[in-house]
Amino acid sequence: MTEGEIPWGPTGELVYNRTYSRVKPDGTRETWPETVERVVSGNLALVDSRYQLPGEREDLLRLMREFKILPAGRHLWASGVKNAQHLFNCWVSGWTEKPSDHFEFTFMRLMEGGGVGANYSNRFLADYPHVKQELEVHIVCDEDHDDYADLAEAGQLSSRYDSDWVDAFVIEDSREGWAAALVDLIDTHYRDDVAHKERVYDVSRVRAAGRKLKTFGGTASGPVPLAKMLTEVSEILSRCAREGEQYRFEDGGALTGLDAMEIDHAIAQCVVAGGVRRSARMAMMHWADWQVETFTNIKQDSGSHWTTNISVEVDDAFWSLAKAPVDPLNPRSTKAHRVLKALSEGAVRNGEPGMWDSSLSNVGEPNEVVCTNPCGEITLEPWEPCNLGHINLAAFVTDAGKTDYIDLIRAHRLMTRFLIRATFSAVADPKSREVLDRNRRIGVGHLGVASYLALTGRRYSQAPGDKRFTAFLREMAAEVDRAAEEFSHELRIPVPVKKRTVAPTGTIAKMPGVSEGIHPIFSRYFIRRIRFSVLDNDQFLTASQYAADGYHVEKDQYDKSGNTWVVEIPTKDTLVEAVAARFGRDAEDIVESANELTLHQLLAFQALYQTCWADNAVSFTANVDPDAYEGVDVAADLQRFSGLIKGSTIFPEESFPQAPYERITKQQYEAAAIKAVADGVDEECANGACPIK
């Protein structure tokens, strides 16, 4: 690589321009070196310059320009942006004594482009008062509004009120304004006395669909999705009140975990209507909860809840019961076995629900963690954000197939310091500020791991038994811990409660073109699908160019607004060629793809990283052939690795239409009549969960 040359992966520049390159004041877009300069400057400015190491700025610039270190996408998008340095990708929304707090927090974080996890176990909602009021939402709008006709066509405009109604709740054109309307509606449902059961909301001030959103990117969705959301939320809460009447409760009916999950889905649908991948969620429920068996099948049975991943919370008690023979006289024993059956059969059916082990996850935590972020790599307290950065191991392999240890150690230490500085970034909610200051949690992760192993002549399946590699991981973990302790003591702040993780890194790994996270390459040949928002002019033009070039382009069937297109790109992985250049004919033996590995081998690799590297969690998707595995096979492996992994996502290939990737043969690839783009990593998270930024 010549000086100044950017080591893009085959589609890296496309992904960078679509996702992270900001528009400058003169109307042109940032180049990668300009983005790096902004990101590093913004990060260093969070802490007084006297705490910088000699040469730290120059090292950060170099390592990031060369894709040797890469902070999470939100840092790349927002770091160094004046008055908009929102650096945290994902959060967990908790539960307070006020029901609307949870939904307001979820709505705000999703509108900021973040992902939100929540635990819907009914123990968290048990102390809530009953929903007391049945209400009816009426939407009004000025007839001169650009979207007035769309509101009318969608059936959202009131036939009883208009925008001159003086008692209407006027919704301001801001995230806070939208959230205030939601809070008003929810709080009204809980009031003892309400004078007017018909709640009128005026959307005249909400900007029209398609307008640019400057701070977080994307485009405005207009008032229609907001109107639909308010109506749906009111219908859910009114149903709760009616059910209370049915059971002769004098003060209404209870909000259940599944009701709350339905409200969050309505909120997320409203947000995602504004453009591609602006909503990502994780929904969890405890295995012993009275609603869990409905929860495990809720996406399949309802055809809804497409805005979230779902996982069952298990614990030591669950594994103790599930590993023992079923006791038909013990209701907890029979339930544990039913839940394990649902987990294992769901895995080979459609990949859901996943599993999260709360007992293992809470080891070493000062306070209870209740859920993970949507991709599952960070377990969090209520209101806590995740704060991620990654080391690209593959970038430290020399031309001779050796590891540049000096620069690699430097990278681990500098990324640790980068993320600790980020904990000083502003957050919008004081509940988040409190837990962030107390925990200072960071997540230094690895990407390009499969690429690193292959480029150093090692097979992926043999890594768990490779003592050199396990020692290497422990050594790098120790470097992170030392750097965190030293820097935290200098800054007079608590040492981060946990420091190391593995994230999917789908979009991030796309830029240098290496394997994402710790996943093996998907296949030597496959179809990769990229999503584009047609509301964003640049993305629309790019997708249109793909169509003109002969690529297959169709609407995203999961985005009901019709605002997202899916482009299919036949893809050849480049790792085999790179390894062949170093090791000759052995490349085919060295490079292993996911379909050549057993579920046991995949989970063993996850367990390796969980035990030797991560004190947080490891986000990992084990893709399996549904024809080769039955539920009992999955159950056996889950039991075998219980206590070693904090969560699991086991995913059957081709389990849903428009999957991010689909394996094809070499012959199918060569038969494609279009120019293929060479690369081996998925552009989204491995489980399709992460936000676009």
Curated annotation (Swiss-Prot):
Disulfide bonds join 90-386. One of its GO terms (molecular function) is nucleotide binding. Its cofactor is adenosylcob(III)alamin. Gene3D superfamilies: 3.20.70.20, b-12 dependent (class ii) ribonucleotide reductase, Chain A, Domain 2 (3.30.1620.10), b-12 dependent (class ii) ribonucleotide reductase, chain A, domain 3 (3.90.1390.10). Its EC number is 1.17.4.2. The active site is at residues 375, 377. The keyword Transferase does not apply. Belongs to the class II ribonucleoside-triphosphate reductase family. This is Putative adenosylcobalamin-dependent ribonucleoside-triphosphate reductase. It comes from Mycobacterium phage D29 (Mycobacteriophage D29). The gene is 50.
